[in-house]
């Protein structure tokens, strides 16, 4: 996926989860943060950030904050992009005979990101974006997510009902050793992921090639599940 109108700046502060103050060409600007997660390990005063300049006038903010540099690693933190990355990745043929793609498909009490049909296979997919990294390990979630736990339980129910089910973690950066659930932040999510795995939900993790103005799915990353 490509972005346009990218500007480089320095992060100053984050008054709330929706906006941030940044400096661009020596001028302070208010920007929209395209990720309502905590991102405390990323948005540190003085770090280099990448912003997309809006192409229409009637907005409260002129820029969207989409990326940040953390050491030598460039991280895309746009929470709207993982589904788009997954859609593009589908074109590479992981699901053979793919003939139908529908976004936002309801199953019982959940709405999953994708419903696929490939030959005789009927598949639900839930996509999760990952921006949290510690010492080369990708972690999800970065905050407690009861909604995420609910999705995992209902993916398991979909398997029991005869569907295939996947949870796909799109790691929005490169150079990752492995992915693991962040049990320090939300033990229940880690437990639910282990149970989903045991009940037949397939778990995939993909890293991404990230530049200042693009993001594309890269390689599979090892998934490590640890009993709590």
UniProtKB/Swiss-Prot annotation:
CDD domains: SfsA-like_bacterial (cd22359). InterPro entries: SfsA, SfsA_C, SfsA_N. GO terms for molecular function: DNA binding. It comes from the Bacteria. It holds the Pfam family SfsA. PANTHER family: SUGAR FERMENTATION STIMULATION PROTEIN A. Belongs to the SfsA family. NCBIfam families: sfsA (TIGR00230). This is Sugar fermentation stimulation protein homolog. It comes from Desulfitobacterium hafniense (strain Y51).
């Amino acid at each position: 996926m490509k972005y346009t109108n990218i500007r480089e700046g320095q992060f100053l502060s984050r008054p709330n989860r929706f906006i941030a103050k940044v400096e661009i060409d020596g001028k302070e600007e208010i920007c929209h943060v395209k990720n309502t997660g905590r991102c405390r390990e990323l948005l540190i005063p003085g770090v280099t950030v990448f912003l997309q300049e809006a192409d229409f006038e009637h907005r409260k903010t002129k820029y969207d904050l989409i990326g940040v540099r953390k050491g030598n690693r460039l991280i895309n933190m746009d929470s709207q992009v993982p589904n788009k990355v997954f859609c593009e990745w589908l074109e590479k043929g992981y699901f053979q005979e793919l003939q139908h793609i529908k976004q936002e498909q309801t199953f019982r009490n959940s709405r999953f990101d994708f419903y696929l049909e490939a030959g005789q296979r009927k598949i639900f997919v839930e996509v999760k974006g990952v921006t949290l990294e510690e010492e080369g390990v990708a972690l999800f979630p970065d905050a407690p997510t009861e909604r995420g736990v609910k999705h995992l339980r209902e993916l398991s129910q979909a398997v029991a009902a005869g569907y295939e089910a996947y949870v796909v973690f799109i790691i929005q950066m490169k150079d990752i050793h492995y992915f693991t659930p962040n049990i320090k932040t939300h033990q229940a999510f880690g437990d639910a992921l282990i149970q989903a795995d045991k009940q037949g939900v397939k778990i995939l993790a993909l890293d991404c090639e990230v530049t200042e103005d693009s993001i594309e799915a890269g390689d599979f990353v090892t998934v490590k599940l640890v009993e709590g």
